[in-house]
């Protein structure tokens, strides 16, 4: 019998409604197969660091340059996080204060640009990110944005277009990276183009930072002037972000983060980032990164064998983008049916998608979270089979038959997940 104290005992006594909802979310994360590629599980150590008294302390400024007293221990924690980031990624400078990925990217704009300046990024429907200048984002409203995409024949970044647009539009900043890129990003090719047009190259590695740290994706260091990343995806840290750069941009970035955009940093998050970075420096993390990529390759291979159309024909990293057009269904109904069946992924636009963003042609899935639970090739093949079953049932349009498939698969998923510990949650 587990005699460990209930970690939510105080919360249950104060606010049982919230405590019950947290427990329900814990069960959901344990019982489902989580394939959203931007999600993961943090370790118990990271969870513990996040929920500490560090949240009580205001710390405007930077280590040894604060506006409030009582920073003796906060300064040490933030300095440790900075030094670990510099060591892990091999960079000159790191800022660990950005609240999340979008504020981190906005700090880059504030540091380098004036309103109306031209920026260039991957078009959102092609796999880019809102903050790379997409029109509905502040970055596309306050700045002049131009986009590049992928080749229609290969689904890979069209470097001829990147070069052509860069030469024609002369952007001051070029973003390399995105949210739905299943292939290796050629940072050297981006750097060559950026140098030609005298642009600052920003590598947004939010999705792949853990793969870079684990040595299974080429690093942008030495190619990019600035590197932006979240800490909560493949890096397995808390919800936060980091900006890394050469010394040339260090002061401008620090000033843009504080006082430009933010006040006091979230010290509890900074501590958890430090813990996650230490975990990422261990040999086991390199094994984890390799297993993410290996699992994605098996999952992609099995989906291809079952007749699914994968954007770019496969994957080199953690992410798979599936165009369901050939299956006769759209992404949203398949994603929702799979969720009811215990498999969580997201509907997503695919390159050159004729459908609307809220009802797109594709689904996006990845392997970071299932790999964190210790799943391997056999489980990837089973997951592909379940995805195929549910997709086929959706395509047939028989709601009663679909409900039966969903119910059966959900039960099978629950049985499978019992065999794999849930990081941070199993007590």
UniProtKB/Swiss-Prot annotation:
> What GO molecular functions are on record for this protein?
glycine hydroxymethyltransferase activity; pyridoxal phosphate binding
Q: Where in the cell is it found?
A: Cytoplasm
Q: Which residues form a coiled coil?
A: none
- Recorded catalytic activity of this chain's protein: (6R)-5,10-methylene-5,6,7,8-tetrahydrofolate + glycine + H2O = (6S)-5,6,7,8-tetrahydrofolate + L-serine
Under Enzyme Commission nomenclature, its number is: 2.1.2.1
> What keywords would UniProt list here?
Amino-acid biosynthesis, Cytoplasm, One-carbon metabolism, Pyridoxal phosphate, Transferase
- N6-(pyridoxal phosphate)lysine: modified positions: 233
According to UniProt, residues marked as the site described as Plays an important role in substrate specificity are 232
* Chief subcellular location: cytoplasm
Q: Which domain of life is it from?
A: Bacteria
Q: In which pathway does it act?
A: One-carbon metabolism; tetrahydrofolate interconversion; Amino-acid biosynthesis; glycine biosynthesis; glycine from L-serine: step 1/1
Q: Name one GO cellular component term.
A: cytosol
* Cofactor(s) required, per the database record: pyridoxal 5'-phosphate
Top-level EC class as recorded in UniProt: transferase
InterPro entries for this protein: PyrdxlP-dep_Trfase, PyrdxlP-dep_Trfase_major, PyrdxlP-dep_Trfase_small, Ser_HO-MeTrfase, Ser_HO-MeTrfase-like, Ser_HO-MeTrfase_PLP_BS, SHMT-like_dom
Question: Pfam families annotated for this entry?
Answer: SHMT (PF00464)
The UniProt annotation places (6S)-5,6,7,8-tetrahydrofolate binding at: 124, 128-130
Assigned protein family? Belongs to the SHMT family.
What is the protein's quaternary organization? Homodimer.
Q: What does this protein do?
A: Catalyzes the reversible interconversion of serine and glycine with tetrahydrofolate (THF) serving as the one-carbon carrier. This reaction serves as the major source of one-carbon groups required for the biosynthesis of purines, thymidylate, methionine, and other important biomolecules. Also exhibits THF-independent aldolase activity toward beta-hydroxyamino acids, producing glycine and aldehydes, via a retro-aldol mechanism.
Cite the HAMAP family for this sequence.
Answer: SHMT (MF_00051)
Q: What is this protein called?
A: Serine hydroxymethyltransferase
Q: Which organism is it from?
A: Acidothermus cellulolyticus (strain ATCC 43068 / DSM 8971 / 11B)
């Amino acid at each position: 019998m587990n005699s460990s104290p209930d970690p939510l005992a105080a919360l249950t006594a104060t606010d049982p409604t919230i405590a019950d909802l947290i427990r329900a979310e814990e069960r959901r994360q344990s019982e489902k197969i989580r394939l959203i590629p931007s999600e993961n599980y943090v370790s118990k150590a990271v969870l513990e660091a996040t929920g500490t008294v560090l949240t009580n302390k205001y710390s405007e400024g930077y280590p040894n340059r604060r506006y409030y007293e009582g920073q003796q221990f906060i300064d040490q924690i933030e300095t440790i996080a900075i030094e670990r980031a510099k060591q892990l990624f091999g960079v000159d400078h790191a800022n660990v204060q950005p609240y999340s990925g979008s504020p981190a990217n906005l700090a880059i704009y504030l540091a380098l640009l004036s309103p109306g300046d031209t920026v260039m990024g991957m078009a959102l429907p092609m796999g880019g990110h809102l903050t790379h200048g997409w029109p509905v984002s502040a970055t596309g409203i306050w700045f002049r944005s131009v986009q590049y995409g992928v080749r229609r024949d290969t689904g890979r970044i069209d470097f001829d277009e990147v070069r052509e647009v860069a030469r024609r539009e002369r952007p001051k900043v070029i973003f390399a990276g995105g949210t739905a890129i299943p292939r290796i990003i050629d940072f050297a090719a981006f750097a060559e183009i950026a140098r030609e047009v005298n642009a600052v190259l920003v590598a947004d590695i939010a999705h792949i930072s853990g793969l870079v740290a684990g040595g299974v994706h080429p690093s942008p260091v030495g190619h990019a002037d600035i590197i932006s990343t979240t800490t909560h995806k493949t890096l397995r840290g808390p919800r936060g972000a980091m900006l890394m750069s050469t010394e040339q941009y260090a002061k401008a970035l620090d000033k843009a983060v504080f006082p430009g955009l933010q006040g006091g940093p979230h010290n509890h998050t900074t501590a958890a980032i430090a813990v996650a970075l230490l975990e990422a420096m261990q040999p086991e993390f390199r094994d984890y990164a390799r297993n993410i990529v290996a699992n994605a390759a098996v999952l992609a291979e099995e989906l291809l064998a079952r007749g699914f159309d994968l954007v770019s024909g496969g994957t080199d990293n953690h992410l798979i983008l599936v165009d369901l057009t050939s299956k006769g269904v759209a992404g949203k109904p398949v994603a929702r049916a799979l969720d009811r069946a215990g498999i969580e992924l997201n509907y997503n636009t695919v390159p050159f998608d004729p459908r609307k963003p809220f009802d797109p042609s594709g689904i996006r899935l990845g392997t970071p979270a299932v790999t964190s639970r210790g799943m391997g090739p056999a489980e990837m093949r089973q997951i592909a089979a379940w995805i195929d079953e549910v997709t086929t049932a959706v395509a047939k349009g028989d709601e009663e038959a679909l409900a039966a498939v969903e119910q059966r698969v959900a039960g099978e998923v629950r049985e499978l997940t019992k065999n794999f510990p849930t990081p941070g949650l199993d007590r």
